[in-house]
């Protein structure tokens, strides 16, 4: 259900900064229809690229509900519900379940710098409180917290924890986690540049920034890699390499929102 290219969709904002800034619902709907038409395999709402850290809890729930309602079951919706407060993560995950999200993506608690045991207890508390499929999210470059493979394997035994978005670009971790957590545990990358190799090492797909602007190419590349067509996947991967790099010339999501603005999908607000 959660394989292939899953877009880490941006959250379109009406131009403005401060209390007058609002979610641009028509632009969001237009983007979602574009992704469904282009073959995107799932939508990830309010993740890092969706500016989860700057949305209020109310805005989080509004965006998740809007996306679930617009998509209307045509492809899966994964809701970003992580927080550096366990109570807030539980609250956001509850909201996602109530509005009909198919799964949740929970980033490691940022800024707090928890121990591995602290990470285990945090995720265990969320998983045991809310009955919805949950995907761990490890992105130490953004959080100053690295969830190690042994901790991920340990968490894989808990009901409702179905996989991990492993965004370190450390391909050695794919086999470490796969060997420990088993074949059914979902392994997703968050690094567009290494997606092809991640899948060929045994991963299941990507939660992608690049898919915001090249959804069909990312979907096709993932499908080729998953089918074992190394040459076909490599050809598409080579075509996408420059785009991957350009979308990270500044902090995500600044470049990708700039491109979407230039393409006419969204207004200029970040």
Q: Predicted regions span which residues?
A:
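Active-site beta->alpha loop and helix N-cap motifs at the rims of alpha/beta catalytic domains
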Residues: 1-144
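A general structural signal for well-ordered alpha-helical segments in protein cores
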Residues: 3, 28, 60, 64, ...
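Structural signal for hydrophobic packing residues in well-ordered secondary-structure cores
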Residues: 13, 35-36, 40, 68-75, ...
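Electropositive phosphate-/nucleotide-binding environments in soluble metabolic enzymes
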Residues: 22-25, 29, 37, 57, ...
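Catalytic alpha/beta core domains of metabolic enzymes, predominantly
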Residues: 128, 142-248
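Short, well-ordered beta-to-alpha junction loops that form the rim of enzyme active sites
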Residues: 139, 167, 261
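Conserved short secondary-structure transition element at the edge of the structured enzyme core
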Residues: 200-202, 239-270
């Amino acid at each position: 259900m959660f394989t292939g290219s899953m877009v880490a969709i941006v959250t379109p904002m009406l131009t403005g900064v401060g209390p007058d800034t609002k979610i641009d619902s028509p632009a969001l709907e237009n983007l979602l229809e574009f992704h469904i038409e282009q073959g995107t395999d799932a939508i990830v709402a309010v993740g890092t690229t969706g500016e989860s850290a700057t949305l209020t809890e109310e805005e989080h729930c509004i965006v998740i509900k809007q996306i679930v309602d617009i998509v209307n079951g045509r492809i899966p919706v994964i809701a970003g519900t992580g927080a550096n407060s366990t109570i807030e993560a539980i609250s956001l995950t509850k909201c996602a379940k109530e509005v009909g999200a198919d799964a949740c993506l929970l980033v490691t608690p940022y800024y707090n710098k928890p121990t591995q045991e602290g990470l285990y207890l945090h995720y265990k508390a969320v998983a045991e409180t809310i009955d919805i499929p949950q995907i761990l999210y490890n992105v130490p470059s953004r959080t100053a917290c690295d969830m190690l493979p042994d901790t991920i394997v340990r968490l894989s035994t808990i009901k409702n924890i179905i996989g991990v978005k492993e965004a370190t670009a450390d391909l050695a971790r794919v086999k470490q986690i796969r060997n420990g957590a088993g074949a059914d545990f979902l392994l997703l990358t968050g690094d567009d540049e290494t997606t092809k190799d991640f899948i060929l090492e045994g991963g299941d797909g990507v939660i992608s920034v690049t898919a915001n602007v090249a959804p069909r190419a990312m979907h096709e590349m993932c499908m080729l890699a998953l089918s074992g067509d190394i040459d076909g996947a490599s050809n598409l991967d080579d075509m996408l390499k420059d785009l991957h790099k350009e979308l990270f010339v500044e902090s995500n999501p600044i470049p990708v929102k700039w491109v979407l603005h230039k393409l006419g999908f969204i207004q200029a607000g970040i």
